[in-house]
């Protein structure tokens, strides 16, 4: 029997979550099998995932019809479908949640992407989601926008688990980590237990390389007269995301060594783990599991789409590489400022955050439109 390399990753202190959720895999028993036998210890979802799951699948039709008969508006029908799937996934993962002492076993659901820049609306929806879904191992996904951080702080203070998503820059990760700390401190000051709260910071990868590679390709296409300059440009391709992630992990280590964090640990706090997201390789010329292999290391999570899960199970070369070549990672990021390369990483990160929110709003709106069309077909005349 061939080795499932996903199971090896756990030995290095990294958890593998799946970036996918559909009713099919819940009802068929596939999700249960992946959790029990294949090393999957959490689930992340987003509007794009639910758009694919619901829009073209008859498995949801009976529930849609029930919503129509009950006179529910489209958005409430959408929530009834998604909340049911999230609850069932939480129940399947509950044994992992308990066996891992609440380290793993979480299912993430994102607040509506349309409120990514509205602090109060984000807090309000997080409360409602947590209450209505009613599962202790639920994680609320909140985008790491500037208005999102006060929401993270408040939601943590109220005792909810939080997945801060769409983090691209090291600075945005650090800001997120301290928002988690402030939320715990606030809760502690109110005399409440902080030992049952979990958080992950979702740090995105492949989108960074896709953006920067396109900029480099554009420079190369224009023509570069100097061979040395051409070599500099090519040396950066496909390397920035992993280097950036390694630097984020170094910041994580500084934070957990801080006196402020250690005081929270003494009161029972659980560390906020870095979660590697957007880990499917977009360029077919690259190793299809490079965003997994290069970032295996302790106290981290990698959320992986189904195709990449299969690829990694089959041929991942697993070792603890998260802290290898860290000096080279610093050098590579610094080299982006070289006049011959001239890529402003801060601008790239800002672009990606705007794009990231848009990439969730578009499928969310598309799903609302698809549901509206389905309702017309399924509604009694």
UniProtKB/Swiss-Prot annotation:
Keywords: Cytoplasm, Pentose shunt, Schiff base, Transferase. SUPFAM superfamilies: Aldolase. It is found in: Cytoplasm. It catalyses: D-sedoheptulose 7-phosphate + D-glyceraldehyde 3-phosphate = D-erythrose 4-phosphate + beta-D-fructose 6-phosphate. Its EC number is 2.2.1.2. The keyword Protein transport does not apply. One of its GO terms (molecular function) is transaldolase activity. GO terms for biological process: carbohydrate metabolic process; pentose-phosphate shunt. The keyword Metal-binding does not apply. Pathway: Carbohydrate degradation; pentose phosphate pathway; D-glyceraldehyde 3-phosphate and beta-D-fructose 6-phosphate from D-ribose 5-phosphate and D-xylulose 5-phosphate (non-oxidative stage): step 2/3. GO terms for cellular component: cytoplasm. The active site is at 141 (schiff-base intermediate with substrate). It is an enzyme of class 2 (transferase). HAMAP family: Transaldolase_2. Belongs to the transaldolase family. Type 2 subfamily. Transaldolase is important for the balance of metabolites in the pentose-phosphate pathway. NCBIfam families: PRK03343.1, tal_mycobact. This is Transaldolase 2. The lineage of its organism: Bacteria, Bacillati, Cyanobacteriota, Cyanophyceae, Nostocales. The gene is tal2.
